[in-house]
Amino acid sequence: YNSYMHGRQYYYGLSLGAAYKFSDNFSAFAGVRGVYASTNYYGYVEDIKVGNMPLYKVLDPTKETAANIELSCDQSGVGFTPIIGVDFKTGKWNFAAKYEFKTRIRLKNKSVNQVPSIGNLPDNLRNAYIAGGVPEAAANAIIGNPDIQGAMGQLKTEFDTKLEKAIGEYEDGKKIAGDIPAYLALGVGYSPVDAVRVNVGFHWFDDKHATSYNNRQEKLKRGTLEYNAGVEVDVNKKITLSTGWQNTNYGLPDENLDTPASKRYMDDKSFVVSSNSVAVGGVYHINKKMDLNVAYFHTFYQHKKTSEMVQLSAEKSINYSSDYTRNNNVFAVGLDINF
């Protein structure tokens, strides 16, 4: 078969909050962020074959696209995120913490999808027998055999189940859970001299309790952990340089040959892999009100390998292995304007 899929996800946020300075050293913040989510997915699977036979010849021999699967789905939804934070400064040290509560979002589907059906399989097989020279009465007897009827019923059930698993998430009119997980950030900053600033941080995303389609999050071992470190140096009054590192570690389950389907998290539509990122950046201070920022970072993604046994028939099965990874390079340019 031939397959293709692409997608985009845009999450627009508008935050409103207030901070209060309790003393020269301690301040606190509380606020809320409104989130509007807009996503789009398009993909297809074509030229599906069973063995060497095109599947459409079984489903509808008169239509070559009868077995094709095509997905075109827009999703949108709204959510709200309460946020709290604290900051404490003493001497050359700065300590800060922020917690963002879970954002409940339900994405509404608007879809124009094409999916195959095997409801006409008995009639198509009957017609194929007759076209091949089998008498009509004999063809009717074959198709009407209880064992044949039972096998085709079982095949239809399995076909519909697998199809629902593949694209049921994008069915037109359906509302899909797409929560943004709760998020804890801890940071420590230290400035040994005025021109040098060193920062380290820790992030925790509570992915395991952020509801997703079919409660997929329950398959995770834990939420995502991130560790960060960075250094910023004022070279002179005009130029500031910086570098940083981040480690991202997802709580992915093991997926070996004996892992049941109900415990498998990774799939071809959506996957994540742990990574390390390194970055460099610079600021050119144009004047007191304008700064030009440039940055580059590269992410080194790990490989997540999975294996499963696919049962082709009662007597035959194959071992199917996947290797998930990706690549990422980001360049950024920005202009800060202080009014």
PLM regions: where:
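Outer-membrane beta-barrel porins/channels
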Residues: Y1-F339
